[in-house]
């Protein structure tokens, strides 16, 4: 979804699915053409999220990826990206499918039975709708879990790497103002906040290292 204003120089701010694979942006830090802004869908960020989760839970020899197979293209892209990242990190990757609230519950029971070391929640509307359920299940089964939205960390999720949906409108206003003042859109990165929940980390017996704290945009106590 693109939005533009006549007052803006021929460049536009993009909101919603900004993904490097589409060619819309060359990278999250440096985009090409006439688009910049905030990425809401985190499909193209699976590899980075897996890396950060592995750094937070280095003892995990197996990490699961939760995807919704109903989204065939999106699920497949996330699986391929995660598999490539897992090989590079030398960790085993387990793909877990869930389409509904009941299937999410069953997925966590399976993960606990298999003693999976950590979980990466893929990008899908069902998982956002069931955010509170997923956070609660991760706590119940003591599975370190990474989420795509910072909304998850505000309700007890361990960590997130993705857009703060509640902050999108404010940040778009900031970007628009900077462009109107003459800043080139090519100098504005696509924003992807990283946040940790220290209370959840302590409950899981995890220590957030100084290097991870250094890249965090926020820490929820």
Enumerate the language-model features and the residues they cover.
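Short hydrophobic alpha-helices and adjacent helix-cap/hinge residues
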Residues: 1-221
């Amino acid at each position: 979804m693109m939005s533009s204003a006549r007052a803006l120089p021929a460049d536009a701010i993009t909101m919603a699915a900004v993904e490097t694979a589409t060619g819309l942006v060359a990278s999250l830090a440096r985009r090409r053409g006439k688009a910049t802004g905030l990425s809401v869908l985190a499909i193209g960020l699976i590899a980075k999220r897996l890396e950060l989760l592995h750094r937070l839970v280095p003892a995990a020899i197996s990490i699961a990826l939760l995807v919704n197979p109903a989204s065939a293209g999106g699920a497949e892209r996330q699986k391929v990206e995660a598999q490539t990242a897992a090989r590079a990190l030398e960790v085993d990757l387990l793909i877990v499918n869930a389409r509904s609230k009941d299937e999410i519950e069953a997925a966590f029971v399976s993960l606990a039975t298999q003693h999976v070391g950590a979980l990466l929640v893929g990008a899908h509307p069902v998982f956002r709708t069931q955010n509170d359920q997923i956070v609660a299940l991760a706590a119940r089964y003591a599975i370190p879990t990474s989420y795509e939205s910072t909304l998850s960390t505000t309700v007890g999720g361990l960590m997130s790497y993705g857009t703060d949906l509640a902050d999108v409108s404010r940040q778009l206003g900031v970007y628009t103002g900077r462009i109107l003042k003459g800043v080139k859109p090519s100098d504005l990165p696509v924003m992807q906040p990283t946040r940790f929940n220290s209370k959840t980390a302590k409950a899981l017996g995890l220590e957030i290292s100084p290097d991870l704290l250094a890249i965090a945009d926020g820490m929820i106590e």
